[in-house]
Amino acid sequence: MGIDNSFERGERTLNELAGWSVDAETIRRLCHAEAAKCRRSKGQRLDIATRFEKAPGDWELQIDAGKVNTETGWRDVKVATFAVREPAESCSSEDFAQRELPRPSVRHVIAGIEPAEQFGLRCQSEAQRIDLPAVKSLTILGDGAEWIWNLAHDRFSGAQQNLDVYHATQYLADLARAGFAAEPKASQDWTGRAQTALVADGWAGVCAFVHESLPQMPDRPSLEAAYPRVANYLSGHQDRMQYASRLHRGASIGSGMIEGAIKQLVGRRIKQTGARWKTDSISPLVEFISLGHTEEWDTYWSAM
């Protein structure tokens, strides 16, 4: 109680299901105390390294951040998920949206409200704890936040980097809205075809597609006005757009796992009550909540 739902909800649930009278404040204190204990004992839990070693598939590190209201104002809680995932069936740029990506064989979440440099050290330390076999075997996936790629370069030099394909597509959608302002259906169709070009040939594919479609664009001046911003952004990530080769190998090209974690751990649980949280309490609680959705949860409690 208090992990997936508010402490007040936990109080009501315990009373309804077990007839126990435990107030929300007690549940809050116990949850935070156990979360802090769980983080302190992390170094003693060696089973996670064994799980990663035995897990079949490719290594991923997905990174993102979410906003949390703290006693010092709104802060970024940075979250990273290490995972090993078996490859999906090989597919092309035309049918990748329909492919079924296997669930991770194993995953592990870390979090921190701290500068990116410090969080990078946390990620590096965790990679060592779970026995990352070699940096070159790792793929780092994320959106366009500069701190993510600085972290990747500084702490995991040699790892493959992948810009989330759906994040990149949002920029293509901006172009479409500019060129098809009065035609939402046409805008959507154009975005889909632009995404196919992006996935097939990266930034070069986008350039060719935009050039070829200009004569048919209803509002060409607006698209041309919007293009420099999109070009400046996407061209800076062209080395992170090896989507076609990754699809051929059955690898991930999106960071949906970490975005889902942010939505579940931060958006749904941390923000749902509108409470202001103590900065020192957030990171251990986010990690503790995530533990509850993995096989580590049972192992953690069985060791008590």
For each predicted feature, which ranges?
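Catalytic center-proximal scaffold of phosphoryl-transfer enzymes
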Residues: M1-M304
